[in-house]
Amino acid sequence: HLRNHGFLQTGGTGWSLSPLFDVNPTPEDIRPRYLNTAIDWEDTSASLDVLLSIAPECGIKTSETNDLLEPIARAVSQWRQVAESFGISKQEQDRMASAFEHADGYSAVLT
């Protein structure tokens, strides 16, 4: 919701808005992939197509979208390694996989 904002301290210079905050990955069998705060009037699905379609409305040129999405996709693509480093079992990782591994996920951006 709109009150979900986070700030990062930027050394001794102050604060900056966090690029990501309060993101809760949920497996698709628990909740379908849709946005509670819709970014498109007609389609509330959490999809790469919807994200790309509204980029110009956010002042982002189509040619810039991949440059912005690629670092995020690379980070998300390492989710299993990060989970393992925190001692999360393979069974638990498999349970969460549909929250990270889907057609509109990091593999679509990194291809």
Give the predicted meaning of each segment.
Residues 1-111:
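Anionic ligand-binding catalytic core segments
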